[in-house]
Amino acid sequence: MNIRPLHDRVVVRRVEEKKTTSSGLIIPDSATEKPSEGVVVAVGNGKKNDNGDTIALDVTIGNKVLFAQYAGTEIKVDGKKLLIMKEGDIVAVIK
């Protein structure tokens, strides 16, 4: 991946929801909400505190995370849709 977020920003790839029901019906995109779950694909170096020291991020590449529904900015890198957001927009890490 050719992107490196700055400071306390994180790049997340959304986890796609199922497009069909258990009975085989296809669900159109207009009938589903965007998922608020994803996988971290890149992280910044961290946020600087008042002393100028860098505070490392709590999330790492590969973490499965939950984030606010309208968090982040959608970007396209290498033909893939990704979200770039501040670490504070992530509400939980799924283990």
UniProtKB/Swiss-Prot annotation:
Gene3D superfamilies, alphabetized: GroES chaperonin
InterPro entries per UniProt: Chaperonin_GroES (IPR020818), Chaperonin_GroES_sf (IPR037124), Chaprnonin_Cpn10_CS (IPR018369), GroES-like_sf (IPR011032)
GO terms for biological process, alphabetical: chaperone cofactor-dependent protein refolding
Domain of life: Bacteria
Primary site of residence: cytoplasm
CDD domains, A to Z: cpn10
Localization terms from the record: Cytoplasm
Gene Ontology CC annotations of this record: cytoplasm
Single GO MF descriptor: protein folding chaperone
Keyword annotations of the record: Chaperone, Cytoplasm
Similarity-based family: Belongs to the GroES chaperonin family.
Quaternary organization: Heptamer of 7 subunits arranged in a ring. Interacts with the chaperonin GroEL.
Purpose of the protein: Together with the chaperonin GroEL, plays an essential role in assisting protein folding. The GroEL-GroES system forms a nano-cage that allows encapsulation of the non-native substrate proteins and provides a physical environment optimized to promote and accelerate protein folding. GroES binds to the apical surface of the GroEL ring, thereby capping the opening of the GroEL channel.
Protein name per the record: Co-chaperonin GroES
